[in-house]
Every structure is written in structure tokens, then in C-alpha cells.
């Protein structure tokens, strides 16, 4: 739980800087680049994060990596601050929170569309456009399949679930019939 609040705080701070200097998209890309770099080089990330190694040596390794990465001065300072506060291991969580803040700033919402069968791109686009009109924001849809739905679709937008599946409709009919029998 602590990592969540800490990551949110750092992501928010970077977002405020990005809003101020107009570089929110650049910082998003740079965060993504550094996470991809750490994913490709887990030993390096472990070395930088491991307190058993000398702190100055780890910092020098981080600075060398950042210098070769072509990152902005703000991003280098941000990552060095994360390191100095022993928070560099939270970089993925910071990146996730930053993504959500950047999307919120742009009026973009991520949603999941689950269907029993594969939907045509035309159908997906119509659903996306309808959702965007209803909530007044741009929608990025992740499309998934779940044959257990039998038919229809389920859409999840944050905490909101719009369930138009045959499975749920059959369940609701069964519950209604049960109540009708006992009445």
C-alpha cells in the first residue's frame, strides 16, 4: 500500500512539472523508455536498487545510464531523486500513475470490451463512438473474448460495468423466476 501512495505522489509531482513546462508527453515517453530499458536489463536495475552495493557507485552507474539514454534534464533529475530517496524500484508504478494522469489531462478513458465472439472492427468502432458520446471523453478500448458470456458484450470503464451479456440476462431471469415461485 505504501508503494501505491508513494508512486502516486511522485507521478503527480512529475505531472505538475510537465503541465508547467508543457512537456507531459515527452516525460511520458521518457518514463516508458526507462521502464523498457530496465525490463531489458533486469540485472542493471537490481544493481542500482540493491543497497548492498555502495550508494555512490550505484548512483554513478545510474547517471552513466541516464547520460547515454538521451533523457531530458528534468527526467534525469527526477530519476536521480527517486534513487536518492530509495524509490527507484517504484519506477513502474510511477509510470502507470503518470500514464493515468496524462490520459486524464487529455480527456482519455481506458475501457475494456468483452464479447463472446470476435467483433468486427466496425462493430468495435461503433461501440467506442457510442461510449465516447455518452461519457464525453475519448475512449481507448481493449477488446477481449470470453466464450462463457454466450452472447452480448460487457464493457468496463473504471468502476462502471455495463453488462449486456446473455449470461447475465439468463441469470437475472432465473432470479426473477425464483422470486416469483416463492411469492
UniProtKB/Swiss-Prot annotation:
It is found in: Cell inner membrane. It comes from the Bacteria. The keyword Cell division does not apply. Its main location: membrane. InterPro entries: ATP_synth_OSCP/delta_N_sf (IPR026015), ATPase_OSCP/dsu (IPR000711). Gene3D superfamilies: N-terminal domain of the delta subunit of the F1F0-ATP synthase (1.10.520.20). GO terms for molecular function: proton-transporting ATP synthase activity, rotational mechanism. F-type ATPases have 2 components, F(1) - the catalytic core - and F(0) - the membrane proton channel. F(1) has five subunits: alpha(3), beta(3), gamma(1), delta(1), epsilon(1). F(0) has three main subunits: a(1), b(2) and c(10-14). The alpha and beta chains form an alternating ring which encloses part of the gamma chain. F(1) is attached to F(0) by a central stalk formed by the gamma and epsilon chains, while a peripheral stalk is formed by the delta and b chains. Belongs to the ATPase delta chain family. This is ATP synthase subunit delta. It comes from Desulforapulum autotrophicum (strain ATCC 43914 / DSM 3382 / VKM B-1955 / HRM2).
